[in-house]
Amino acid sequence: MVQQNIDKIISNYLTKNIVFSEENLLATKLSLLDTLGCIYNASTYEDPMRFATRGEYGSNTNPFLVINDMQSSKEITRYLSILTRWFDYNDTFLAKEWAHPSDNIGTAFGYFFNHKDKNLSEFLQSIIQMYEIQGCLAL
């Protein structure tokens, strides 16, 4: 498939108004809870926290409070994605593959943290779409 076509297909998919089933939304909520657990557990280790924060935010017993001090979506995305990936990679053999769907949730967090007008339903829908896009590209 030509790169241009992939870009167009993804863009078209992202601009469609799709209503996901309750089953899809429930599965996504569980995935989100898993990711939050990964972030929290990874924050209990010094190495990933030092790397994720570049040593700039000191130690904090709640990894989610660190976000309030961050200046940009990019910084939030990097921080949450590193913690998620670090724990997933060290926790389960399947996450050692080249891409894991929860890798993308940090990006969604970064975006939605700075777009307060968005709601949880839109957040969950974006996660479903990220999973579907990554799954199709992986095939």
Protein language model regions, located:
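N-terminal core-entry segment
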Residues: 1-139
